[in-house]
């Protein structure tokens, strides 16, 4: 995975993530939309044959786009950890 910043402003961040597809795009964008202060979050895959997504984040100014992204990633990490613990508990 390689991440490039395409555009960075006070309330807007646009990233290109190489080596990822709809799986990560949907997860990140959906989680971002639930964060207070995020006005808009989306992603798209420029071409169906490429392993690359573009993520766009717009905030209302109460949170920086990078901070919102970090919060979303931490939320996903905690959620995944919870699922791992739940699945491990099933085998007991």
From Swiss-Prot:
One of its GO terms (biological process) is DNA-templated transcription. Keywords: Cytoplasm, DNA-directed RNA polymerase, Nucleotidyltransferase, Transcription, Transferase. It catalyses: RNA(n) + a ribonucleoside 5'-triphosphate = RNA(n+1) + diphosphate. Pfam families: RNA_pol_L_2 (PF13656). Transmembrane segments: none annotated. PROSITE patterns: RNA_POL_L_13KD (PS01154). Gene3D superfamilies: RNA polymerase, RBP11-like subunit. It comes from the Archaea. Its EC number is 2.7.7.6. The keyword Heme does not apply. SUPFAM superfamilies: RBP11-like subunits of RNA polymerase. Its main location: cytoplasm. GO terms for cellular component: cytoplasm; DNA-directed RNA polymerase complex. It is found in: Cytoplasm. GO terms for molecular function: DNA binding; DNA-directed RNA polymerase activity; protein dimerization activity. Coiled coil: none annotated. Part of the RNA polymerase complex. DNA-dependent RNA polymerase (RNAP) catalyzes the transcription of DNA into RNA using the four ribonucleoside triphosphates as substrates. Belongs to the archaeal Rpo11/eukaryotic RPB11/RPC19 RNA polymerase subunit family. This is DNA-directed RNA polymerase subunit Rpo11. It comes from Saccharolobus islandicus (strain L.S.2.15 / Lassen #1) (Sulfolobus islandicus).
């Amino acid at each position: 995975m390689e991440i490039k910043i395409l555009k960075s402003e006070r309330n807007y961040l646009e990233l290109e993530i190489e080596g990822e597809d709809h799986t990560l795009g949907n997860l990140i964008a959906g989680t971002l939309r639930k964060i207070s202060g995020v006005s808009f979050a989306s992603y798209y895959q420029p071409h169906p044959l490429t392993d690359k997504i573009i993520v766009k984040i717009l905030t209302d100014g109460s949170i920086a786009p990078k901070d919102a992204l970090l919060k979303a990633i931490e939320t996903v990490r905690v959620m995944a950890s919870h699922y791992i613990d739940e699945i491990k508990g099933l085998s007991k």
